[in-house]
């Protein structure tokens, strides 16, 4: 019977299922976009693989995972409808990753590890620059994950190398310069 279909009685997932189907339909264009970005930023896929061991961490309710590659980042951005999946504005994140100024990670609910929840932009020492969910927003639900993110930062702090700390110091300076420029340009953050 059609009323027995999961999609009918699991309305909470309706939007997500729709987005997954759209992603499947767009897969070819996403792959082309990923190939284009990988050509332009040839180190990002390798950096993504390096991030796996250092930044991945899970607890009972939440987990932080590193993307496998540029395609995974683009897919995440498209599913959450935010700038990381965008051709134009998303490029700044690949530029930052290429320079090791900041990295993209995914915050997930542990019981739904494949479902996008929040996309994080972090500095090499684990400082969280941005937390974004659907439509480039941050909702009150992120407060529930704040304690987890603090514990995650403590765990990864023990995994960091001197090089990571040096990159983090440089990243902080670049972020401060960017804020000064945004203020000069009267951009509201």
Language model feature labels by segment:
Residues 1-189:
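Catalytic-core elements of nucleic-acid end-processing and repair enzymes
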């Amino acid at each position: 019977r059609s009323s027995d279909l999961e999609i009918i009685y699991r309305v909470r997932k309706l939007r997500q299922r729709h987005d997954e189907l759209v992603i499947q339909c767009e897969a070819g264009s996403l792959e082309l976009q990923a190939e284009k970005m990988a050509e332009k930023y040839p180190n990002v896929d390798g950096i993504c693989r390096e991030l796996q061991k250092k930044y991945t961490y899970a607890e009972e309710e939440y987990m932080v995972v590193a993307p496998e590659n540029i395609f995974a980042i683009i897919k995440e951005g498209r599913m959450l409808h935010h700038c990381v999946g965008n051709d134009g504005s998303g490029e700044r994140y690949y530029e930052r990753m290429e320079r090791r100024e900041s990295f993209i990670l995914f915050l997930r609910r542990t019981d739904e590890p494949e479902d996008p929840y929040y996309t994080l932009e972090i500095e090499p020492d684990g400082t969280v620059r941005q937390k974004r969910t659907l439509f480039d927003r941050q909702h009150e639900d992120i407060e529930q994950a704040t304690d987890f993110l603090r514990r995650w930062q403590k765990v990864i702090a023990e995994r960091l190398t001197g090089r990571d700390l040096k990159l983090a110091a440089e990243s902080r300076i670049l972020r401060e310069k960017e804020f000064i420029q945004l203020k000069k340009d009267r951009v509201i953050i």
